[in-house]
Amino acid sequence: MTNIRKSHPLXKIINSSFIDLPAPSNISSWWNFGSLLGICLALQILTGLFLAMHYTSDTATAFNSVTHICRDXNYGWVLRYMHANGASMFFICLYLHVGRGLYYGSYMYTETWNIGVILLFAVMATAFMGYVLPWGQMSFWGTTVITNLLSAIPYIGTNLVEWIWGGFSVDKATLTRFFAFHFLLPFIIAAMVMVHLLFLHETGSNNPTGIPANTDMIPFHPYYTIKDILGLLLMITALLTLVLFSPDLLGDPDNYTPANPLNTPPHIKPEWYFLFAYAILRSIPNKLGGVLALVLSILILVIVPLLHTSKQRSMTFRPLSQCLFWLLTADLFTLTWIGGQPVEYPYVIIGQLASILYFSIXIILMPLTSLMENHLLKW
């Protein structure tokens, strides 16, 4: 008699995806982040569901309902801060996951990669709409500034902004629809994750060498389930440390002031995980140019597979490309820092130089360096 996990219609899908799945024997801890992202998503959906039970999406009561959750609902403060800081953990894992893909050439699986880029956009949209819901000062003004960017689109811009707002300014209609979309999108993301995995399992995982590992595979369970649990414990430890010791470390103090359309905060800035894109947006003096640069800063990931000129897939044996990769990483840290600074000398020029470097590395320097490495290896 065959094992039920191999014969039952539902159990065998789970079995072939998480238990008997053949995985390369040499994948490192950089391959942990996929499972961590899945756990982050589940955590966000669960905490979000319980928060939604107490939250009211009305401009008059939204701020007070969040206060009520923190003060009166049983362990409401844990739910609220797990959800807020869970988003930060989500983005840390996301950026490391994308970085791993860039370093080891995982983007050569184009379907998996492109769905991943769409997922990144979807998560960013969800996080942006979630930031609006507490209806604090930064919620209100952040939304006003970012949605207003769409007015830079020729002809339809102004109408589009008013259509998204549901009026002539960010108001009750905006808050209600953002709550609806913030609730809906994670479930769409979960469905897209399934498609992401479906395409990944068509090809199998990449590995640090970038060489096909078909001759040396091991079952996912128990080897990588145990390995992933270690990553999970480290992430949960970091998250709980953040939630229980300094839950507001990554937030903005301005968001503890109820939204006031008549009083603009001195420095409007998004959450830390959007600061690099915000810095790129601000580095271009033209509104439409800034918006295009903002979108391209993420959309550039789609053309990465087209710009792959190396004869090797991974960067493991390519020291020059490695230098560029870590320069890009440092550049992203610089952009994140600049995004949180006021628009004044010397931050403006640093932001502009960092933005130029960001696009130069990805579009020009990486492909040229790869060609040079091919030549040096006489390939």
UniProtKB/Swiss-Prot annotation:
GO cellular component: mitochondrial inner membrane; respiratory chain complex III
Cofactor remark from the record: Binds 2 heme b groups non-covalently.
Membrane-spanning intervals of the chain: 33-53, 77-98, 113-133, 178-198, 226-246, 288-308, 320-340, 347-367
Needed cofactors: heme b
Domain of life assignment: Eukaryota
Keywords assigned: Electron transport, Heme, Iron, Membrane, Metal-binding, Mitochondrion, Mitochondrion inner membrane, Respiratory chain, Transmembrane, Transmembrane helix, Transport, Ubiquinone
Molecular-function annotations in GO: metal ion binding; ubiquinol-cytochrome-c reductase activity
Sites where the protein binds heme b b562: 83, 182
Reported function: Component of the ubiquinol-cytochrome c reductase complex (complex III or cytochrome b-c1 complex) that is part of the mitochondrial respiratory chain. The b-c1 complex mediates electron transfer from ubiquinol to cytochrome c. Contributes to the generation of a proton gradient across the mitochondrial membrane that is then used for ATP synthesis.
Subunit record text: The cytochrome bc1 complex contains 11 subunits: 3 respiratory subunits (MT-CYB, CYC1 and UQCRFS1), 2 core proteins (UQCRC1 and UQCRC2) and 6 low-molecular weight proteins (UQCRH/QCR6, UQCRB/QCR7, UQCRQ/QCR8, UQCR10/QCR9, UQCR11/QCR10 and a cleavage product of UQCRFS1). This cytochrome bc1 complex then forms a dimer.
Name of the protein this chain belongs to: Cytochrome b
Organism: Myotis albescens
